[in-house]
Amino acid sequence: SGFSEIDDDFYEELEEILIMADIGVATTDRIIEDLKEKVKEQKIKEVSVCRELLMDTIKQQMKVDETAYEFEHKTSVVLMIGVNGVGKTTSVGKLAGQLKAKGKKVILAAADTFRAAAIEQLTEWSNRAGVEIIAGQEGGDPASVVFDAVNAAKARKADVLICDTAGRLHNKKNLMEELRKINRIIEREFPEAYRETLIVLDGTTGQNALVQA
């Protein structure tokens, strides 16, 4: 902006810019308060210096520490969900490769039977990762695929079963019921397994990602 000094007007415009960027009100408030504190402590007067501080503050607020998933250490079933086109199948493949590299025995369930070529895509990822895949026919029952995959995971003593699923919105009742059916099968057939559900989101979605979740 064209501000020459750091004053209330400067902070008000900065707040508006951050909120318009869909950072969220709570995070914006934390960024502004942290910035004000640093400006006061360091007795900063120049806007150009404040801009550098702002970048550091935003990075600190957005920082996510790398943590191990619980399912890396337990016999687990991981359900991958999300809307269409966000990269669920690719995420399944990459996660499988990462776990395989750590010495885990992984099985993939191709439970996205709706999207054309989804099974072929996941098969390619399973080949790259060097892991087994359980698949049915395109247009088949996803719950049946998960049932077969759960039994295969138990029989082969797999460490992690990762289930790819079709893209769905939370307001599509039939697809959400399909997801509930899959969950019921896992709970019934593999109650001893640790459960994890991962939602894959588009990074440009912004605050609407909370609605999807």
Language-model regions: role of each:
Residues 1-111, 118-139, 144-154, 158-163:
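Primarily NTPase-proximal linker/entry elements flanking Walker-type ATP/GTP-binding cores
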Residues 84, 166, 202:
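Short glycine-/small-residue-rich Rossmann-like dinucleotide-binding loops
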Residues 115, 167, 205:
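Short, glycine/acidic-enriched loop or turn micro-motifs at the edges of active sites
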